Amino acid sequence: VGALRGLYAGEEVDADSESFGFRAARLEYGRADMKILLAGRGPRMTDLGGRLADGFVLSWVHRDLLDDHVTSLRLAAKAHGRQFTIVWSTMLVTTDADLWMARESLSFRLPDSPAVVKEMIGMTEGDTVAIRDALRHGGPPAAARLVREEWVPHFVLMGSPEAVADEMLSTMARCGIDEFQLPSLPAAAGAEAAATSIRRTAEIFGAEVAC
């Protein structure tokens, strides 16, 4: 984050870390007002985001933990006297096709989730091993079959379009979340699939959108 701030400000930057490093790097098109948002899971990442970043993306977080994450982020940002943007990203599940896509998306997220999250949904070590094995041999489509349907509602907004809209807005208001972000689709789905997702979401909220 420190290196990015220097680069965006147009400075010449040296950086060293465990996984990469560079010398005399510079961005000719740097913008000093560029906002830096982090994303991740677990208390260490949220603490880092609250202390150093301009915002944080809470992606596919167990919904019972949203309040605690937001509170931790706000407290850390307040301690450093900064404006802070909190973004929530997850799927809107209103059809059987959505449910299957959510199971695919969770197949590569759940195995690396914190132990407390696995305990909350009743996911065992055996489940973790089986899903990872399925991912290695058949990718998300194969692993999705091992993601139990009862796990899904803990991470997504699920129900009728009206219920999903009401739940999203009430959750954001209760937790103090600033923005909602649709999750990215696989590259193979193409631009039209992304446009369809945006249009459908706009319809759920009674809005108009040009894609």
Language model region names:
Residues 1-211:
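Active-site-adjacent structural elements that line small-molecule/cofactor binding pockets in enzymes
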